[in-house]
């Protein structure tokens, strides 16, 4: 892991850009006398790690005593998409304009994205936990639920997860959800135009966790109330501090 820039922000948060091989990422930390617990904050849908909403979440969470990391997966930020990914997305746009079913198209490119991103996140986690200022435990706090399910099942260092029911979850991850046993907070926007409500409720029901909490709020995809950040903070404090 090589740090390429750093900036001390007004709230005392240190924001550092890093590269790990071909993986670009951002790490937010604050000065602490002891190593900080770590929150992984993945994103997808082509968003860059510099997306303002993601950066605001990272800084806010770090200011409350966590180390927070995000990376650009393939196809996000400046990382190129594969030809197959570009073709699938073009077909998705065509099908949506025509009002045709899109599940199989989502399946064709979201599944491979998860398969490719999970090893990169494990590599990133290995490198982050070697830093003296980070000691764990580790939580998942990303909007990319499909990736979170895969990591919650395959990465024992992750001990709690917060998911947002706002994107397509491939069949493989819907099956894997039954193997998720860590404490779970699941956010659902009741009127999310891109995520069928019943499918999200079925996914919540499938999770095998004995401690799982569903927070449902009225509104569309971008309408999550600000107070959910406070509730999420209490959830992570219980399990990571």
Q: What is each of the regions a protein language model found here?
A:
Residues 190-195, 222-223:
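Acidic catalytic loop of the alpha/beta-hydrolase fold
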Residues 201, 205-223:
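Catalytic histidine neighborhood in serine/cysteine hydrolases
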Residues 172, 193-199:
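Conserved alpha/beta-hydrolase "acid-adjacent" motif
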Residues 38-133:
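Serine-hydrolase catalytic machinery in alpha/beta-hydrolase-like enzymes
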Residues 180, 186-188:
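Short beta-strand/loop motif that positions the catalytic acidic residue
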Residues 115-179:
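Primarily recognizes the serine-hydrolase "nucleophile elbow" in alpha/beta-hydrolase
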Residues 1-37:
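N-terminal cap/lid segment of alpha/beta-hydrolase-fold proteins
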Residues 218-219, 224-241:
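Catalytic active-site module of serine/aspartate enzymes centered on a nucleophile-bearing elbow/loop
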């Amino acid at each position: 892991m090589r740090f390429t820039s750093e900036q001390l922000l007004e709230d005392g948060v240190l924001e550092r850009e890093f590269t790990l091989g071909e993986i670009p990422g951002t790490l937010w930390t604050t000065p602490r006398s002891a190593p900080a617990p770590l929150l992984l904050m993945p994103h997808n849908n082509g968003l860059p790690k510099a997306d303002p909403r993601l950066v605001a979440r990272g800084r806010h969470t770090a200011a409350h005593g966590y180390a927070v990391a995000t990376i650009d997966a393939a196809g996000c930020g400046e990382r190129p998409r594969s030809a197959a990914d570009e073709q699938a997305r073009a077909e998705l746009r065509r099908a949506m304009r025509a009002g045709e079913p899109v599940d199989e198209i989502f399946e064709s490119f979201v599944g491979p994205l998860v398969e490719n991103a999970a090893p990169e996140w494990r590599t990133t986690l290995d490198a982050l936990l070697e830093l003296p200022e980070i000691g764990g435990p580790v939580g998942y706090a990303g909007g990319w639920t499909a990736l979170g399910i895969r990591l919650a099942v395959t990465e024992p260092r992750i001990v709690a997860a917060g998911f947002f029911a706002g994107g397509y979850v491939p069949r493989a991850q819907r099956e894997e959800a039954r193997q998720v046993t860590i404490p779970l907070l699941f956010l659902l926007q009741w009127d999310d135009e891109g995520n069928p409500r019943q499918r999200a409720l079925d996914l919540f029901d499938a999770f095998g966790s004995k401690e799982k909490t569903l927070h449902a709020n009225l509104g569309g995809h971008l309408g999550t109330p600000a107070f959910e950040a406070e509730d999420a903070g209490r959830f992570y404090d219980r399990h990571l501090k």
